[in-house]
Regions:
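Conserved N-terminal helical subregion
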Residues: 4-19, 24, 34-36, 61-169
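N-terminal Rossmann-fold NAD(P) dinucleotide-binding loop
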Residues: 28-29
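Glycine-rich FAD pyrophosphate-binding loop
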Residues: 36-56
Length: 169
């Protein structure tokens, strides 16, 4: 079952709101991009010291009907395709004998191509407005305050937001 959301109506609800996103991983950055495209005031808070702090990590595959759909809506699908690598699959038994193979063919090359985690982060960061991401800000408490939220960070600083989206992990 697919649920359709009237995005124009939803974005109008956020037009005068300050939205905080906790986490500058793929989900947090994609959400920031989608909301910024619709004129929402976004700040992303990330515990990493800077965008190069996590140079390790493997690859991610974005499936056609989920991650690729989000990249499409964010206007970043072609950039993703430019850096992603189509992947074939071999299924083997316990002795290493190939039981079945799925080779990459032109018609399935974009089914779920792999992209380096850091390349994906760079694509998403470059799509955001300057100063959207505040680095080295680890959230330690989140408290309601009337119609707003108070975010307190490990460095004892605090910020206020109308809406908080937790996207860590």
């Amino acid at each position: 079952m697919t649920m359709r959301i009237d995005t124009d109506k939803q974005m109008n609800l956020l037009s005068d709101k300050n939205v905080a996103i906790i986490g500058a991983g793929p989900v947090g950055l994609t959400m920031a991009r989608l909301l910024q495209q619709n004129g929402v005031d976004i700040t992303v808070y990330e515990r990493d010291k800077d965008q190069d702090a996590r140079i390790f990590g493997g690859t991610l595959d974005l499936h056609r009907n989920s991650g690729q759909e989000a990249m499409k809506r964010a206007g970043l699908l072609q950039t993703y395709y430019d850096l992603a690598l189509p992947m074939g699959v071999n299924i083997v038994d316990e002795k290493g004998n190939i039981l079945t193979t799925k080779n990459v063919r032109p018609e399935n090359r974009f089914d779920n191509p792999e992209i380096n985690r850091n390349d994906l982060r760079t694509i998403l960061l470059n799509s955001l407005q300057n100063d959207t991401v505040i680095w080295d800000r680890k959230l330690v408490t989140l408290e309601p305050d009337k119609e707003k939220w108070i975010l307190t960070f490990e460095d004892k600083s605090s910020e206020t937001a109308d809406l908080v989206i937790i996207a860590n992990g």
